[in-house]
Amino acid sequence: MERMWSRWFAVLSALVIAMPAVPRSRPRYGGTLRVEVRADIETADPPASGRGLPDLAGEFTITRWEAGRRAVYSANESAVGRPFLDSVEIQLARPLREQAIDLDLGRADVVELGPNELRRVAAGRKTWTSAPVHVVALVFAARVTDARVREALALAVDRSAIHNVLLQRQGEISGALLPQWLSGYAFLFSTAVDLPKARSLAAGLSPAARVLSLGFEDARLRPIADRVALNARDAGLAVSVGTSNGDVRLVEARIESADPARALSGVAKALSLGEPAHADSPESLYAFERALLDGYRAVPLFHLPDVYGVGARVKGPPGVTSLGEWRFGDLWLEGNRP
């Protein structure tokens, strides 16, 4: 009898293995997730690459596009594992302060949070945070040919003060292009302030060479630019801040890949540092990054995450990955689930 049951069990096991997989149906809870972003996308068609809206492709399909104003994505009925939501509505070009107000008033479900907004986040408010995926750096124009002025400014910047006060300790202080979580060696790049050496370098410059203009493109970076200018003054440099393309720019580049070599290539391209050679080991990757930063053409300052404030009715796992990709397919809204 025992032998017979063993044979039957073997036959049944083989049948189960041979059966084709049946796509698992998912419940349809419905509802519209209301998202606000500050990006002002004026293109004729919705973006097809990058982070944010393009991440919805596959699970959702675009059904309405109002350039610079609004995008609506509806659940893709053909997707394997249909989203719980019926749709996602994204309001574009919303200032961070207004986003935070809309979240507090229940007019939005997911909003972006900057350092100023994080100060005012109510206790217990749910947030989603990516890994530090934004590189904030100073990049010198080609016309700034004297390496001494570049090094003097690099040594004068007090990253710790900016990080603690202006950034609310968000992200990480860094002197590297790649964040520590990705490369494992970012700590080897110095972030120390050395005012005596900075002053010594500045003292050897002509009066004209000590005058620099600092430009920025993103208004969120203005407070950091102002603090960098104050630090520069302590080193004997005169830095004026404006939104134009200055002698040095305060810029932000995004980590687009979890592969360190590809990520370094993308950041180097975004900062106009050239294309690093292909790295086939952590040691060669470190050497290439060190070569890109020699001469202080670019001075990394911080690595910052994406941070989102999330409304109370949003349920499910975090809607962003470590790289900041949107993953809304497993979210549902309270009151729409039986």
Give residue ranges: language-model regions.
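Alpha-helical secondary-structure segments
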Residues: 34, 87, 132-175, 209-221, ...
